[in-house]
Each structure stands twice: as C-alpha cells, then as structure tokens.
C-alpha cells in the first residue's frame, strides 16, 4: 500500500515554496519562517492508518488517516481544512479544501528520493526529500 513512503525523510531542496504559500494565503511573517524551516517527514503505517508527522523548527504536525476517507486537518499555517488522501498509481494525492478553495499535494518516490509537489491554482512548488 504505502510501504514505499515509510521512513524518515529530510528536506534537501525546495523550489517556489514562498510563491505557493502566498497563493494559499499564508501571511508574510509565517511564509518567511516556514520557508527557512527544513522539516523532516516521518511516515508510518499502523494497521489501516497512515501517519505523516512533520518536524521542524517552525512547527511539528501530525496527521493520521485512512486512504480515501475525508478527515479534518489543521495545517501548519493554522488553516482548518477538509482533507482526503488517496493512492493513485503509486502517488499519494492529498487534497485540502477550505473556504471554497483547494490545493493538491502529491507525494511520489523518484529513485531514493521523495518528491512532494504542491499545487494551488497555477502555482507549483516542488520539494525534494532524502532518507534521513
């Protein structure tokens, strides 16, 4: 199921993240602090639950979910969203919806890397992680 994603991942590169956060509606000060953070992602599977923990100097967050089941999420920038995460062709597709808006975050393996693509309207940010 999600075994290819299981492990601890450290951020090694980030492109266009500030523009993505701006499009999402994140304020200037939060964008600056979040943009400097180098989070680790810890992904695990516990029964039929997938757990994704993000740890950084900015904020620690954790979501646990069943694939295909909508859940309430509070994002690192404190948005209250409805989220649903599915597995589509080996890609974890995370859709967040709030206030008539939506963003999609895709996680996929590329060799020994974890590539996270964040899309909001026409703005895309790509963040690359390696095993920690």
From Swiss-Prot:
Which UniProt keyword terms apply here?
Acetylation, Cytoplasm, Lipid-binding, Nucleus, Phosphoprotein, Transport
How is the subunit organization of this protein annotated in UniProt? Monomer. Homodimer. Interacts with PPARG.
Under what name is this protein listed? Fatty acid-binding protein, adipocyte
The primary site where this protein sits is cytoplasm
**Phosphotyrosine: which positions carry it?**
20
Q: Taxonomic classification, please?
A: Eukaryota, Metazoa, Chordata, Craniata, Vertebrata
**UniProt record similarity statement:** Belongs to the calycin superfamily. Fatty-acid binding protein (FABP) family.
Residues with PTM N-acetylcysteine: 2
